[in-house]
């Protein structure tokens, strides 16, 4: 299932929001989001279930919840504007959807950066079937 997310990222093209999110992740972590965050733990990548495994996985859980709260928006494909200076990401002008999507992505990227010290390579490409705990509500 998470492999589909990676394929979706590659098919969206350079204008897609997922690639903008990947760029934000690179700014905050100096890591490429696709291998490091596209299939990490129980929540990073497509979908999510169970309990977040660590602080990085919780960043993804919160990001998923942020996207869920957006109505009449397409968070994985809408294009937004943002800038960065000295490691600070600033969401730019745009529609209410674009601004909210950008803010969801910005908060997640900052969260990833803040939790680099606890990132566990053993949670990369974590199999969904191991995420069996009851899921939290947003």
UniProtKB/Swiss-Prot annotation:
One of its GO terms (biological process) is arachidonate secretion. Keywords: Calcium, Disulfide bond, Hydrolase, Lipid degradation, Lipid metabolism, Metal-binding, Myotoxin, Secreted, Signal, Toxin. Disulfide bonds join 42-131, 44-60, 59-111, 65-138, 66-104, 73-97, 91-102. InterPro entries: PLipase_A2, PLipase_A2_Asp_AS, PLipase_A2_dom, PLipase_A2_dom_sf, PLipase_A2_His_AS. Expressed by the venom gland. Ca(2+) binds at residues 43, 45, 47, 64. Residues 1-16 form the signal peptide. GO terms for molecular function: calcium ion binding; calcium-dependent phospholipase A2 activity; phospholipid binding; toxin activity. Binds 1 Ca(2+) ion. It catalyses: a 1,2-diacyl-sn-glycero-3-phosphocholine + H2O = a 1-acyl-sn-glycero-3-phosphocholine + a fatty acid + H(+). GO terms for cellular component: extracellular region. Its EC number is 3.1.1.4. Its cofactor is Ca(2+). The active site is at 63, 105. Monomer. Snake venom phospholipase A2 (PLA2) that shows myotoxic activities. PLA2 catalyzes the calcium-dependent hydrolysis of the 2-acyl groups in 3-sn-phosphoglycerides. Belongs to the phospholipase A2 family. Group II subfamily. D49 sub-subfamily. This is Basic phospholipase A2 Bs-N6. It comes from Bothriechis schlegelii.
């Amino acid at each position: 299932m998470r492999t589909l997310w990676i394929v979706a990222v590659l098919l969206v093209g350079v204008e897609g929001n997922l690639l903008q999110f990947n760029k934000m992740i690179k700014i905050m972590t100096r890591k490429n989001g696709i291998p490091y965050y596209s299939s990490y733990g129980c929540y990073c990548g497509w979908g999510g279930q169970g309990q977040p495994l660590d602080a990085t996985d919780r960043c993804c859980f919160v990001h998923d919840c942020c996207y869920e709260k957006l109505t009449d928006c397409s968070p994985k494909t809408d294009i937004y504007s943002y800038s960065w200076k000295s490691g600070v990401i600033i969401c730019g002008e745009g529609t209410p959807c674009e601004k909210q999507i950008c803010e969801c992505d910005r908060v997640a990227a900052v969260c990833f950066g803040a939790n680099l010290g606890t990132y566990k390579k053993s949670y990369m490409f974590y199999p969904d079937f191991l995420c069996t705990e009851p899921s939290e509500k947003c």
